[in-house]
Amino acid sequence: MIYGILALGVYITYKILDFPDLTVDGSFPFGAAITVRLINGFGVPAILTLPIAFLGGALVGICTGLIHVKLKVRDLLSGIIMMTGLYTINLWVAGSGYVAIFDKDNIFNNSFVNSITPGFLVNFKNVIIIFLITMVAKYLLDWYMSTKSGFLLRAVGDNDTIVTSLGVDKGLVKIVGLSIANGLVSLSGCIYAQQQRSFEISIGTGAVVIGLASVIIGTSLFKKVTFFRVTSSVVVGSILYKACVAVAMFAGISPNAIKLITAVLFLIILVISMDRKKVKAC
């Protein structure tokens, strides 16, 4: 379910802003890098790494937005530039390409969590904690999207002339959207690092594909389910995606082939969805 938070971030850029943001592949490990540095280097309590990682990712999103809006660089190239630069930044922040935090407290294993967790739930505490954080992120995003700022965010993706006609800077709205999206992605990386108790420089490879696959699976399967919010379908889509990966690995498919298969399936889904849009347009 960690990837559910990642998928929420990708949902903002892909579905709402219509912005192909490849920054995700860099902001996911950026959140992890911040986390291990704060825990290892500064002894910051694990719970505080969550908002700090979110703010770090938000800053990354702002940089992507500024490159696109102020420097007039195309959206795809803006993401590629940030993703490339973040590789080095992540190494600087973490200190090396691999950092372990096995002997440190984290949000899943600390004196407070251990003291309040009933014995029969010990084996499920990781899932429960991730579920709670994901639900908080989801409902906060739902709330934000119901505000005036959230309305402007949806409008700038559908028809940015509406935003301009309201006297609002559409570029600023895009920057805000990118900051929230990458904040969520970085938060996901923060939780991932604490679950794995380590940081590895390559953990962001393919993160955007995972996020997009989750968004497309969720929104496609639950498009006609009226009582399901889109954010809920996106989170469920991430769970279904990981379940499919688990089944594939159980069936004996090499882990090295999983991402290739994911990319091919993702391409097929995209082509099918584009064909459906063309049919509807006709």
Question: Where are the language model's segments positioned?
Answer:
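Membrane-interface helix caps of multi-pass small-molecule transporters
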Residues: 12, 37, 62, 66-71, ...
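Cytosolic-side transmembrane-helix boundaries in multi-pass membrane proteins
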Residues: 158-172, 225, 229, 244-282
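Single transmembrane alpha-helix segments in multi-pass membrane proteins
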Residues: 1-45, 50, 67-71, 216, ...
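Transmembrane helix-bundle core of multi-pass membrane transporters
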Residues: 75, 79, 86-146, 176, ...
